[in-house]
Amino acid sequence: ENYGAKGEKDGANISYETTDGQVRFFYDHATHWVTSDEEGPIVTTAGSFQSELGCSADWDPACMRMWLQDKDADGVYTIATTKIPAGTWEFKVAVGLTWTENYGADGVPNGSNIAFTVPSNGATTTFAYDSSTHKTTVTVK
């Protein structure tokens, strides 16, 4: 198999340029999307549910299991999962795989945790982070 630009099977080659000679690449095996830290921020949701998803600990901004992606380059980073168990959970959005830049409720830098409830196991939980307002919406279906 081979995947190219925008994660498309047999898609166009992906090319990158760097200004300082160092670049980190990120690949999502599930979506086949590739990006780099030079193309835009790496955004994750760090929260109380991460250990349930296979992260080594909760509240770990470096765990890529909840990597939000902006595949269409519109500034809105999203991820959907059915793996968060039923319950009430909290999270923040972390930028750059650390807590240095993070956004809580109402897009406030270093703001309070954002709470959400998953009503049943297997429900689809979608996170959407708007990089212009720093607000995150959570939809559970």
Indicate where each model-derived feature is located.
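Fold-core signature of tandem repeat domains
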Residues: 14-16, 23-27, 34-36, 114-118, ...
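Phox homology (PX) phosphoinositide-binding domain
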Residues: 61, 138-141
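A glycine-anchored, Pro-Gly-centered beta-turn/N-cap motif
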Residues: 21, 85-87, 123
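Surface-exposed loop/turn motifs at beta-strand-loop junctions within extracellular Ig-like
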Residues: 29, 95-97, 131
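Aromatic-rich carbohydrate-binding modules that target alpha-glucans
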Residues: 1-17, 38-86, 96-117
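Extracellular/luminal beta-rich ligand-recognition
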Residues: 24-33, 48-50, 106
